[in-house]
């Protein structure tokens, strides 16, 4: 059964994920002219660079949509963002600075909620603006068919007729003008930007070249902290979690997760917190480069992980990190709602996040420069008296206890010496005086 349609489905309802930009505007009008019945669906993801959401459906109707709907996805996006923080679902980092998978989270919400809205309108063909070289074409494919097994996919950008007639932005702009809409292309930037409430992605064009970097980017969620003329004052901020959920910032309870993210974005954005420059592997295994913003996600993640390390033991933390790396990859691949992802996510939410209650106070400076000033939690297993360098009463263990513990290590040390000697005999190790390893003589 054919799932991907390569020609305009004449006379049929076609849902299009409509942003109001040139690409989707031209595609909608073009499909209308070719005989399709376009239905426009716009996701309100709290994009920081979108000024008027209500205007977008009006544009779609003007361009020929049979119906245009604005779907508020912000609560769902906030919920998935918190789940990602609870599970540490982030697998891409450079030098300890994390990419918070904000675009994959947005696609998970958009792909499911827009297709669900289409089902309500008996629309079973879906198109969007993703290209064949990127990740989104596969993410939307997976989430769309997961939500509606009867869904067909039609993307104008995979239709050779569309490409021949409207192959570039100049052609699209001329087409819209010819159709009587006077559409003018926005000023060309040196890169493209995609955003939602959780973060922004800047990529392509000049940013495809590694000798262009963060200095050509104009942040939309924070300040250009690398510019010396931009004043950034140090600021103290506290974040409170209750059973793994962020509930207050600076002592003020914020019940609505959307409002909490917006406040975290405002605070983190004043410092440029959460900006990163990453080289990553796309789903198709080719490398790409992106510059990312995520001020609120970064602030919440820092506070959450501080509590995790103060509350849980080493083995739990290790498993949390290993599972988080795996879950991050699944999220990136468009598998956030697959059973293996749900298993990893709910494990972290149940056995890690549930114990994370407390408040972390930080000082934010420029960019990702910060200090942790205080950590408070009723569940802390950090007890300074256990390892105090001062003399304490009722110490949990004595020098004699440590002597016994060290003596037990002799068993492991003997085995280790024997194995190193075996490796040396096989030529795998050099045990001469010029190496850091001592000269070992097996069981001698």
From Swiss-Prot:
Q: List localization entries.
A: Cytoplasm
- Alphabetized PROSITE patterns for the sequence: ARGININOSUCCIN_SYN_1, ARGININOSUCCIN_SYN_2
Catalyses which reaction(s): L-citrulline + L-aspartate + ATP = 2-(N(omega)-L-arginino)succinate + AMP + diphosphate + H(+)
What the entry lists under Pfam families is as follows: Arginosuc_syn_C (PF20979), Arginosuc_synth (PF00764)
GO molecular-function term, one example from the UniProt record: argininosuccinate synthase activity
Q: What is this protein called?
A: Argininosuccinate synthase
Task: Tell me the pathway.
Answer: Amino-acid biosynthesis; L-arginine biosynthesis; L-arginine from L-ornithine and carbamoyl phosphate: step 2/3
Family the entry assigns: Belongs to the argininosuccinate synthase family. Type 2 subfamily.
PANTHER family given in the database record: ARGININOSUCCINATE SYNTHASE
Q: Which GO terms describe its biological process?
A: argininosuccinate metabolic process; L-arginine biosynthetic process; urea cycle
Quote the record's binding site residues for L-citrulline.
99, 135, 139, 192, 201, 203, 280
Gene Ontology CC terms: cytoplasm
